[in-house]
Amino acid sequence: MKINGNLNIDSPVDNKNVAIVRSRNQMFFKAFQVAPNIWIAPERYYGESLKINEDQKSDGGIYDSNFLSTNNEKDEFLQATIKLLQRINNNVVGAKLLSLISTAIPFPYENNTEDYRQTNYLSSKNNEHYYTANLVIFGPGSNIIKNNVIYYKKEYAENGMGTMLEIWFQPFLTHKYDEFYVDPALELIKCLIKSLYYLYGIKPNDNLNIPYRLRNEFNSLEYSELDMIDFLISGGIDYKLLNTNPYWFIDKYFIDTSKNFEKYKNDYEIKIKNNNYIANSIKLYLEQKFKINVKDIWELNLSYFSKEFQIMMPERYNNALNHYYRKEFYVIDYFKNYNINGFKNGQIKTKLPLSKYNKEIINKPELIVNLINQNNTVLMKSNFYGDGLKGNVDNFYSNYIIPYNLNYEHSINYSYLDNVNIEEIEKIPPINDEDIYPYRKNADTFIPVYNITKAKEINTTTPLPVNYLQAQMIDSNDINLSSDFLKVISSKGSLVYSFLNNTMDYLEFIKYDKPIDTDKKYYKWLKAIFRNYSLDITETQEISNQFGDTKIIPWIGRALNILNTNNSFVEEFKNLGPIFLINKKENITIPKIKIDEIPSSMLNFSFKDLSENLFNIYCKNNFYLKKIYYNFLDQWWTQYYSQYFDLICMASKSVLAQEKLIKKLIQKQLRYLMENSNISSTNLILINLTTTNTLRDISNQSQIAINNIDKFFNNAAMCVFENNIYPKFTSFMEQCIKNINKSTKEFILKCTNINETEKSHLIMQNSFSNLDFDFLDIQNMKNLFNLYTELLIKEQTSPYELSLYAFQEQDNNVIGDTSGKNTLVEYPKDIGLVYGINNNAIHLTGANQNIKFTNDYFENGLTNNFSIYFWLRNLNQNTIKSKLIGSKEDNCGWEIYFENNGLVFNIIDSNGNEKNIYLSNISNKSWHYIVISINRLKDQLLIFIDNILVANEDIKEILNIYSSDIISLLSDNNNVYIEGLSVLNKTINSNEILTDYFSDLNNSYIRNFDEEILQYNRTYELFNYVFPEIAINKIEQNNNIYLSNNNENSLNFKPLKFKLLNTNPNKQYVQKWDEVIFSVLDGTEKYLDISIDNNRIQLVDNKNNAKTFIINNDIFISNCLTLTYNNVNVYLSIKNQDYNWVICDLNHDIPKKSYLWILKNI
C-alpha cells in the first residue's frame, strides 16, 4: 500500500487526490486522498457544534472551539495523520489492514435491475466531480480528545451491504497508562478495525451488549456493558476470558452476519462480476473484498496488532479504565518525538510536555462519597468517575436461558489476513469520476449524542478505600506526613496520609537531629529514605490457612482500609479468606437450562441407527455442559474479578501516591541543602545527578510493589473461583448429569427394536459415568494471569546495560553491544579476536589498548544495584598494578585491576570511602568466570569466581559512587582474553550464576527447532520465523533457481532438503560464528549462492561458486538462527511477484523477524 506523503494544506486542488468536497450537512471542506479510497480532512468534524452547553460536556473531555482552526494547525494535522498511516503501513500486517480498507468498498445499491449505484463517494460543489471514498479521517468533534467512528447509513452497516464512514481523530494529544505513553498509531488502528465492520456491513445491533464489570462503587448491583464491536476489538485477557460467545448469547449475530456476507458475496458472482455496465475497477475491488472471510475481521484485535507493532497496551479491562484512572494529556511533536517506527525513544523513555489543556479537563464524577462523623459533619468528599460504558441494573444472568441448539462457536484466533494480496491490490486502477453513478440517499442524518452525567451522592461513616486513597494525595510541595488517617482528614490539607511504617519511624527518629547541611549527611539521609521506602513498599509475607499457601501484602489494609480492624490485615485475611476483600460476595446466579428430550421418533430405530443418534445427543449434551461451565466462568470474571481488578487499580494508585510523597520529601530536602549549605557548585551538581538516579531507583521499587499487588489480587480472585464458585458449579453439574443419565436410560429402556443386551450397552455408552472436566483446567487460567503480572507494564527491555559481542569481518574486527541501550563503542582498529569459551573473545595485548563503552545507563549513584560479569583468561604474571575494567571519574566509581598476580575490585565514593577486595591468583592461563554483584539495599558486595563465592563484603560506608557514563576496557600492558563482558542493572544470586556458568559452557552450539544441537552433514528443512509451517522451496525463473516461500499454494511445492557443510570435515556440531556452506539435495547436489542481479539466494551446481555464510543464534529465541554474508543478513522478503524471496541485501525496512531462520529435522 502506498501512502501519499507529498501533500500539504496548500496543495492545489487537482480533483484527483486533492478536492473541495461536500459533507452530509452540505458544508464544504478540503480533503486529501492519501491512499486509494482513504481521505484526510484536516478539519474539526462538521457534525457537532464546537460550542455546546456545559451539561452536554462529558466527564474527562476537553472542549476548545479554536482547536484546529488555522492553516498551520490543519497542515500539522495532515502531516501527523499521514505519518501515523505510514507507521501502520511500515508493518506487513498494518499494510494488509490498510489494503483491506482500501478494497472494502460497499456493495453497490441496486436502484433498478442491472442499475447499480455507488454509495461510497464524495462530491464536489455542484456535483461536477465524484470521488470514491471508503473513509474520511477528520479532526475531533466538540470534545477534542474523543476518537470516534461514524457510519454513513446504519441499515447498510448492518445488513451486509456496507457503508462508507467517517473517523474523528486526535493525533496530537496522548496520555500515559502510568508508565508508558499510549501510542496514537494503536488508537488509529482501533478506529480502522472498527471501520471494517461498517464497510463490510457486519455491524452488530446497538442493543447487543456484553455484561463487562460489576460496578463495585455503587451499593446496588449495577453493571457496565460493552458493545460487541468494542469487545471483539479490545483484545487482552478480556477477550480470552469473555470468549463465552455464543454459550450465553441468544442473539444470532455471528450466524446471521455470516449469512448476510455470503449473500452479497454470491450477488457479486451472479450480478456484478460479469456486468458490463459496472466499471472494471469497482469489480476488481469487490473481488478483493470478498476474498476475505468475515471471520477474519472478527479476529482482528488490538492485542494482535500491539504484538506485531511491539506497542504496549493495557491487558485487562482496557475498556473500563476511566473509573479509577484520570488522564493527564501530553503533546506529541511528530517532528521531534515520533517517526514511522513509533516514539523515537520508546513508550517509556520518551519525554513529552504536558498539554496546556490539562487545566480544562471536565470533572464530572458519577458518585460523590461524603465521609461524615457522628454529628453528620462532612469530613471529606471523594469522587468515583464513570468508566464511559453503558450502565444496566438488570442482572443478565438471572434471566438468561442457556440455548441448547445453538452450537455455532466463534473461536478466538489471530487473523493474519493471508488472503489480502497487497501487490494485486496496488495494481487495481483507480475508480474514475466517470465510473461513479452515485446513489443520493447513501447517508443518514447525523445526530450528535451527548453523555450527560448527573452525580449521585452518598454518605458513609466508615472510610472507604477511595477516602484513604484521597488522603494520600496532595498538590502542595510543602508536605507533612502522618500515619493517622483521622488526624489527616481533620487537618484540612496540612497533613497527608502515609502507611509506610519504617519510613515514618525513621523520619520520627531523626526529627530532632541537626540540619542536613553537608553532602555526606545528605547522602546518608537519602540512602536511609530509599532503604526504608523499599522495605515498606515491597514488603510481602508468606501465610498458610485453609485456602492454601499464599504471599500477601501486609500494608494493603492500612493503605485502603480493607480488613483493617483491631486485628492486623494478615490475621484478618488468614481468618476470613480472599472473598472478604470485596464488598459484593453473593452474586452467582444458578443458570437456567433447557435440555431437549430425546425425540420419540427414535424409539423404533435399529441398534445401529440408535447408537449413532444417541452418540450425537451425547456429544451435544457434553457441549452443553461446557456452556454451563462458561456461564459460571463469565459470572466470576464479570462480577467477582472486576472487583479484584478495582482493588489492583486502587492499590497501585496508592503505591504511586506514596512514591510521589517520598519524591516530594526528597526534593524538599534537596532544596533546603542547596539554599542553606556551603557545598561547592561542583558537588551540588553531583548531588543533583545522584538524586535523579535515586528517584529512578525509587520508581523501580514501586514497580516491584505493583507487580506484587497484581499477583496477590489475581491469586485471591483465583482462590475465590476455586473455593466459592467452582463447588457450586460442580454441585449443579452433578444434578444436570444425574438428570441427563436418568432421561437417557428411561428412553433406551422404552426402545422397541433392540434387545436387553443392546439396551445395556447403549445405557453404558451414553451415560456420563463421572464428571469429566476435560474443558476445565484451572492451571491454564492461572497461567493466563501469569503472562500479565504487571498492571503498569514496563518497557520490555532486558536488564542488560552492556552485553559485549565481537566478530571478524574481512578487513577488520567488529566490537559492539547487544543490550539495545544505544551504546557508543570506540576501539582501535588493531584489536585482536580469538575464539573463546563460548564465542569470540577480545585479545588485549598492546600498550594502551583501550575500548570505551558509553551510554547513560552506566551512571551509578547512591542506591542502584548493578552486576558485572565476564570470562577472563590471563596470560601474564602481574606483580604491579595493571588496570583492566573500570568506570571512574574524579576518583569516584569502580574498577577492576591486576596486582600481585591476582585480581582486585575497587569501589570508592565521592567522599573518599573506599573498599578493595583482593581475589585469588588467576594467572594460571585458564579461563575464569568472574561475577561481581552490588546490592545497595542490603549494603552487600558479592564476588564469585567460577561459580564459587570468594567475597561477601559489607559496603554500608560506601555512599555515592556516581561516575561517568563510560566503561573502559584497558590493556595497560596486559596479555588477556575477555569474553562476554556484561553489566546488569540488578543483583545476581548464586543460582543464576550457577545456571549461567554451565549454560555458557554449553551455549556455544546452534540449535534446531527442537532445541537439539545442529550437526554438520545432517539433512534439515529450512523455514522462516514469519511462516514457521511453510518450508523453503525453489522457484525457477529466467533460467535461475531461487529460494522462496510460497505461502499461498505451498502444497504444489516440494520442501528442499539442506545440509550444512564446514571447511573442517571432522567437525560434527555447528557453533556460533561458524562459516558454513549450504548443500541442497535436489536431484543432484547443489549449493547456495547470491545472485549479483537481484541479491536473491540461488542454487548453483559448483561448490566452488557457493557462498560461505556466518551462522549465529538469536539471543532471544534460542531455536532460531541468523545467516550473514559480509555482515549483511539473509532475510525473507515481502511478497514480490507472488513469492516471498530469500534475499541477502541491506533492506532496513524489513522487520527483524524476517531475519530469523529455523532448521527442522526431517
UniProtKB/Swiss-Prot annotation:
One of its GO terms (cellular component) is extracellular region. It comes from the Bacteria. Disulfide bonds: none annotated. Keywords: Virulence. GO terms for molecular function: metalloendopeptidase activity; zinc ion binding. GO terms for biological process: proteolysis. Belongs to the botulism non-toxic nonhemagglutinin family. Assembles with botulinum neurotoxin type E (BoNT/E) and protects it against pH-mediated inactivation or protease activity at pH 2.6 (the pH of the animal gastrointestinal tract) but not at pH 6.0. The non-toxic component is necessary to maintain toxicity. NCBIfam families: botu_NTNH (NF033911). Forms a highly interlocked heterodimer with botulinum neurotoxin type E at pH 6.0 but not at pH 7.5. This is Non-toxic nonhemagglutinin type E.
